[in-house]
Amino acid sequence: MLEEENSQMICQIYRIYTKDISFEAPGAPQIFQKEGSPDIKLDLDTSSNLLAENTHEVVLRITLTATIEGQTSFLCEVQQAGIFFIKNIENMQLKHCLGAYCPNILFPYARECISNLVSKGSFPHLHLEPINFDSLFMNYVQQEAEKQNESDPIIIKNSEQD
């Protein structure tokens, strides 16, 4: 019984915090005179690092760039981070936990920060749709596997006999 408890997979949140935040409206106030909906470009990235044994920091970076008629309306960047205690999770499961599970936890906090920044910048309400981090992670794993297969050398043995 005790052995089962010691081998149970654990992923606990120690802390969630905003690591870095930035909002720019380089075209203000002239941009407020333009009509139409802005084109929104979303860049997303995750990273993680080991802080101590079984303790990981995961950072979700979201950068939004809004343009109207080719002019930048606003640029918003949020780095939402969390410290997670992760135990008895190894290899691919650990990569999935750090690359998909933890970012899923962080995303609502980042989305709220972005929404608040955009509205305080006097721009129309912006609601980011949920992101399927599991799917993004699986695509990443597949791309890495394809890169690995492409970089594996092909060895052709020529066994000519005289």
UniProtKB/Swiss-Prot annotation:
GO terms for molecular function: unfolded protein binding. One of the proteins required for the normal export of preproteins out of the cell cytoplasm. It is a molecular chaperone that binds to a subset of precursor proteins, maintaining them in a translocation-competent state. It also specifically binds to its receptor SecA. SUPFAM superfamilies: SecB-like (SSF54611). GO terms for cellular component: cytoplasm. Its main location: cytoplasm. Homotetramer, a dimer of dimers. One homotetramer interacts with 1 SecA dimer. Gene3D superfamilies: SecB-like. It is found in: Cytoplasm. This is Protein-export protein SecB. GO terms for biological process: protein folding; protein tetramerization; protein transport.
